[in-house]
A protein has these predicted regions:
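Extended, histidine- and acidic-residue-enriched regions that form the cofactor-binding/catalytic faces
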Residues: 1-153
Length: 153
C-alpha cells in the first residue's frame, strides 16, 4: 500500500495484516552531483513502487525519506521516523537506498538496510529498464521473505 488516501483507507481496514514498512532513503545534493541524485531518486521511486505493487496488502510504502547528503543529523531524524513506525505495531522495517553512506551506519539503524546500486534508467530503453527493475524487485523480495520466515517469534 502506498501513502495515498485511497491506500491508507485500505490499510486502516486491514492493518492487522500489514506488518512491514518500506522506507526509501534518497539524498538531495546540489552542485556537480545534482543529476546523479535525481537519477537515484527516479530509480528508487520506480523500484519501491514495483516492490509495493508485488506485495500490496503486506507492505506499507512510506513517503521517501529525503535528506541533504551532508546532513549530520539524518540518522537521528530517521530513528525518530522508525520509532513512530514501531509505535504503530509494524514488525518489519526495511530501508531501501543507493547511498553507500548508509552502509556505514547500518548497525545504528537496527533494521534491515537494503543497499542497491542505482541503475541510470535514462540510459536504457523502456523494456530494458523494466527488465532490470523486475530483476532487482525479485532479489529484494527474496530478502523480505527471508526476514519474514526468520523473524523472532
Amino acid at each position: 500500500m502506498k501513502w495515498t488516501a485511497k491506500d491508507l483507507d485500505m490499510y486502516i481496514q486491514s492493518k492487522e495484516y500489514v506488518d512491514t514498512v518500506l522506507i526509501p532513503l534518497v539524498p538531495i545534493t546540489f552542485g556537480s552531483q545534482i543529476k546523479q541524485t535525481g537519477s537515484v531518486n527516479e530509480f528508487l521511486t520506480i523500484l519501491s513502487s514495483e516492490i509495493e505493487k508485488q506485495m500490496k496488502g503486506r507492505i506499507l510504502l512510506m513517503p521517501t525519506f529525503h535528506y541533504l547528503s551532508d546532513e549530520e543529523d539524518k540518522i537521528d531524524l530517521l530513528k525518530r521516523w522508525t520509532n513512530k513506525v514501531k509505535e504503530n505495531n509494524f514488525k518489519h522495517i526495511f530501508f531501501l537506498t543507493s547511498d553507500i553512506e548508509w552502509k556505514k551506519e547500518e548497525r545504528e539503524l537496527e533494521h534491515n538496510l537494503v543497499w542497491i546500486p542505482a541503475i541510470p534508467l535514462e540510459t536504457l530503453e523502456n523494456n530494458q529498464a523494466r527488465e532490470m527493475i523486475n530483476q532487482q524487485v525479485l532479489q529484494i523480495l527474496d530478502i523480505f521473505t527471508y526476514n519474514w520466515k526468520n523473524e523472532k517469534k
